[in-house]
């Protein structure tokens, strides 16, 4: 995808991870183009268009799970995507599920089992880091910690 940074890690080829940049969307200032967040005051129509633009760059078979980040340490398993969940990390064992977090001044941390059986993503702000969001994410995954890789 144009305007994205692809993860450079040793994950299996079926695991895709990337972080988008701000260009390529329709949101106006102060959201500046590719805003995916409904909660910041941007037009819901623009956010929906931006999310649709993102999903159009990937396979239509994919199901998207977005988070409403709360700057904590909560981790949610995605069995079937639903409305935005309130937590700071997601993990799934389901194929074709895209786990999404939104970041500005926080860091997205991607996780994958070396065998590709499960993936996770965490929204790592300072409050979540202090509360243990990364540790909780690894604990929630069923793979042994030694079999989980991460990309920052």
Where are these regions (language model features)?
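Conserved nucleotide-ligand handling architecture
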Residues: 1-19, 23-24, 29, 86
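Generic structural signal for well-ordered, non-membrane alpha-helical segments
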Residues: 13, 43-51, 130, 134
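A residue-level signal for beta-strand positions that form part of recognition/binding surfaces
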Residues: 14-17, 33, 64, 98
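Surface-exposed, charge/polar-rich loops and edge strands
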Residues: 16, 96-98, 105-106, 114-120, ...
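Short acidic/glycine-rich loop or secondary-structure boundary segments that cap or lie
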Residues: 28, 74-76, 128-131
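Short, glycine/acidic-enriched capping/hinge loops at junctions between secondary-structure elements
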Residues: 29-34, 77-79
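Phosphate-centric recognition/catalysis
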Residues: 44-124
């Amino acid at each position: 995808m144009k305007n994205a940074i692809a993860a450079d890690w040793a994950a299996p080829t079926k695991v895709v991870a990337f972080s988008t940049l701000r260009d390529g969307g329709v949101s106006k200032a102060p959201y500046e183009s590719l805003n995916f967040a409904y909660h910041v005051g941007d037009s819901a129509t623009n956010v929906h268009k931006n999310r649709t633009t993102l999903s159009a760059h990937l396979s239509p078979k994919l199901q998207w799970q977005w988070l409403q980040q709360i700057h904590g340490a909560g981790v949610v398993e995605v069995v079937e995507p639903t409305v935005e969940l309130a937590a700071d990390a997601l993990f799934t064992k389901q194929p074709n599920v895209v786990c999404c977090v939104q970041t500005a001044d926080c860091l997205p941390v991607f996780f994958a089992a070396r065998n590709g059986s499960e993936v996770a993503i965490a929204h790592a702000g300072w409050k979540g880091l202090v509360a243990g969001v990364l540790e909780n994410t690894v604990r929630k995954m069923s793979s042994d910690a030694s079999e989980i890789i991460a990309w920052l």
